[in-house]
Amino acid sequence: MKVYGVNELRKMYLDFFESKGHLKLNSFSLVPQNDKSLLLINSGMAPLKPYFTGQEIPPKKRVTTCQKCIRTGDIENIGKTARHGTFFEMLGNFSFGDYFKHEAIAWSWEFLTEVVGLSGDRLYPSIYLEDDEAFDIWNKEVGIAPERIFRMGKADNFWEHGAGPCGPCSEIYYDRGEKYGCGDPNCTVGCECDRFIEVWNNVFTQFNSDGNGNYEELENKNIDTGMGLERLAVVVQDVDTLFDIDTMKAIRDHVCKMANAEYKVDPKKDMSIRLITDHIRSVTFMTSDGIIPSNEGRGYVLRRLLRRAARHGRLLGIQGKFLAELSKTVIAESKDGYPELEEKKEYILKVLTIEEEKFNKTIDQGLSILSEMEEALVSNGTKTLNGEDAFKLYDTYGFPLDLTKEILEEKGFSIDEEGFKKAMQVQRETARSARAVTNYMGADASIYDEIDPAITSNFVGYDRTSHTSKISVLTTETDLTDEVVGGQTATIIVDETPFYATMGGQTADIGFIVGKDAEFEVEDTIKLKGGRVGHLGTVTKGSFKVGETVTLTIDTQKRQAIGKNHSATHLLQKALRNVLGSHVEQAGSFVTSERLRFDFTHFSALTKEEIAKVEAMVNEEIAKNVPVVTDVMSVEDAKKSGAMALFGEKYGDSVRVVTMGDFSKELCGGTHVANTGSITVFKILSEAGIAAGVRRIEAITSNAVFEYYKSMEEELHEAAKVAKTEPASLVKRIESLQEELKTALSENEKLKAKLANNSLGDVMNQVVEVKGVKLLASKVTDADMNGLRNLGDQLKEKLGECVILLASASEDKVNLIAMATDGAMAKGAHAGNLIKEVAVLVGGGGGGRPNMAQAGGKNPSGIDAAIEKAVSVVENQIK
């Protein structure tokens, strides 16, 4: 049997099924598209679910793919055994109501035996025990003896996932030989050893299950085939494990080289070598698909894999950053099948480098602290690290909980995970209040810590702009107090408030609080610990006391402007996902009354066309003037409704879902307009990158857009005035001025050439002969570098074989150029070396080729000395 590489096998498979009428599709992204049931694509069928369910019409009834997949369910076993991996490629051929069992079985056999060249005697099919149709196809059509066809039960050979389409499977096993067996003479298909390995699985989707054991025959039957590319390579290449196939071995060998280690010598090192080899594939492909390291969702999976690999690199003794360098091998080995890896290489390496740098800055100190904690556990006779200590490692030293857990488990310890969660919650509350306080005149957090925990504030501002309530707390900048008077800066807390505190990227309301003969200007509104809302500002009239009833009124004009910009961010996010893809996720936002800022995950700058599409899409939704509807529901109901939520965000029992027609639906606690038409118009001002894989858009809406265009119009009129034309004719006027400038520059060049020609006769008299070679070293007036070059070319034509050095000065700038003909160079002349020696005399430097070189300087007074020195330099050069 011929041995094929992974890249060859991938191509052979796709080409084979393309020859059978299948549409060959590129691998889908690891980021699921419109599938909230998956964090990452984990099978070949996963991206095609809409075609199987009928939600979407497939591009063709026959499709074949090689799908990149990530599975981290058994991440703890990666490296410990040679069987497990997080990244794999799944080969698949699919039929959507077209061919069925006969073709699927026949083609699987044909590919394995005739294309790949596996021996039919070593292949064993399995079928669902009641699937007589599949048995007859294998037996009568393919020619497999009955005793070599294995009937198995539902657990092994029937694909079913709750209610819905389902069906029997037919797998194909390959006998790798006794050397991979368990030693049992009765070892056969189904044994847990490594001898009989499943290489192919045909799923025959022919029933619809009601979930209660009742099955109805489907009118349109489907084929879902899966074959692990790496597993096929293990069989074809006859190697022990997936870490020995050609592409994996290349990565494994690179790891060994970096660590100066040999594989299969030290079991502990082998574990780290395998783990790094696997994880670097995952992080390379995940980063390529726009996932960036973070503390939530897919980003957390990436960060966890990357940091595990980095730590095991240290265990192997690899010094400094190494993951980006190792990723180059992954890209080199996989770019045939995934050319986007090469296209995004610079981006991938940058993301990996930045993340590894972050980790390296904290890991040494963190490991030292963890070691001290381990010693304390031993001395205290306990096996469990408390949650506060685990959180300290996470919060201070950047150790993910999983990493701390993994390190401790290696040494027989565990972690109090509930205690960790409680410590994190405490930190979040503290951070919120600290941030809020810092935003207000540097007030001390202890002021707010002294407030009775039983005191709360209720926000009532969704449907009102003014409200009457009772003062529950008053503070100055330094103390809790019962009264504040005119001129004092203070914080007022009431039972109920229409003022929105800064949260979720939306800036706070401002306004006034009015009491009996008293006024307070609210300059900021902050969220405090315990759900309290602080109104920060200045007493402008009278005094306020705790217990008094006051009227709170927000600045409605500012609230409306904020609402327009906030609603626009929802439309913007949806438009970005529609135009760029569902990998786009919110990475931050900032909404004020003047403008909005939206940060999102994306791996490249937006083109002008993409920006225009996004802007047009948002304005189209604004023009529809659909109601902005807010519903309060449970988190589960919100998710079922398809509302977008931020990864990792904590929500209460009930949430607010903001819906804008059939275009946008998001979980959001902010304030919005009543209908999209109120936004009036939307304009993107800028788009730029702010971090690896994160872009930022700044935009304006409503009156700000009109002001923007008004300003632009004024600038246009001013420009037209300067150009002495009308705005409508400005483009033509600029084009005309450009032509005039071009003509003037051309005339200028002609004049320079004329001056150079006039200089030609003057300098010809300065030619000297040095060891049989003509040398012309001269000063020229009113010539730039281009003029010197043109003059030099003309002199060469007149002089024949020669060496030329020309110098020109303009104010405090000197230009030098040297030239040598072929004949002069044959005798040893070198223009570059000539320039190098004389340029120092004019306060400059330079060099170049033997035939031509140039330099600049800042000392015109040295020109004469430079010209004089040329003779001795050339004299030394000529042989």
Swiss-Prot record:
GO MF entries: alanine-tRNA ligase activity; aminoacyl-tRNA deacylase activity; ATP binding; catalytic activity, acting on a protein; transferase activity; tRNA binding; zinc ion binding
Enzyme Commission number(s) from the entry: 6.1.1.7
InterPro entries associated with the record: aa-tRNA-synth_II/BPL/LPL, Ala-tRNA-lgiase_IIc, Ala-tRNA-ligase_IIc_anticod-bd, Ala-tRNA-synth_IIc_core, Ala-tRNA-synth_IIc_N, Ala-tRNA_ligase, Ala_tRNA_ligase_euk/bac, DHHA1_dom
GO biological process assignments: alanyl-tRNA aminoacylation
One GO CC annotation: cytosol
Database matches in SUPFAM superfamilies: Class II aaRS and biotin synthetases, Putative anticodon-binding domain of alanyl-tRNA synthetase (AlaRS), ThrRS/AlaRS common domain, Translation proteins
Cofactor: Zn(2+)
Annotated binding of Zn(2+), by residue: H566, H570, C668, H672
Catalysed conversion reaction: tRNA(Ala) + L-alanine + ATP = L-alanyl-tRNA(Ala) + AMP + diphosphate
Record's cofactor remark: Binds 1 zinc ion per subunit.
Localization terms from the record: Cytoplasm
Source organism, top-level taxon: Bacteria
Keywords: Aminoacyl-tRNA synthetase, ATP-binding, Cytoplasm, Ligase, Metal-binding, Nucleotide-binding, Protein biosynthesis, RNA-binding, tRNA-binding, Zinc
Primary localization class, coarse: cytoplasm
Domain comment quoted from the record: Consists of three domains; the N-terminal catalytic domain, the editing domain and the C-terminal C-Ala domain. The editing domain removes incorrectly charged amino acids, while the C-Ala domain, along with tRNA(Ala), serves as a bridge to cooperatively bring together the editing and aminoacylation centers thus stimulating deacylation of misacylated tRNAs.
Free-text function comment from the UniProt entry: Catalyzes the attachment of alanine to tRNA(Ala) in a two-step reaction: alanine is first activated by ATP to form Ala-AMP and then transferred to the acceptor end of tRNA(Ala). Also edits incorrectly charged Ser-tRNA(Ala) and Gly-tRNA(Ala) via its editing domain.
The family this protein is said to belong to: Belongs to the class-II aminoacyl-tRNA synthetase family.
Protein name per its UniProtKB record: Alanine--tRNA ligase 1
Lineage: Bacteria, Bacillati, Bacillota, Clostridia, Lachnospirales
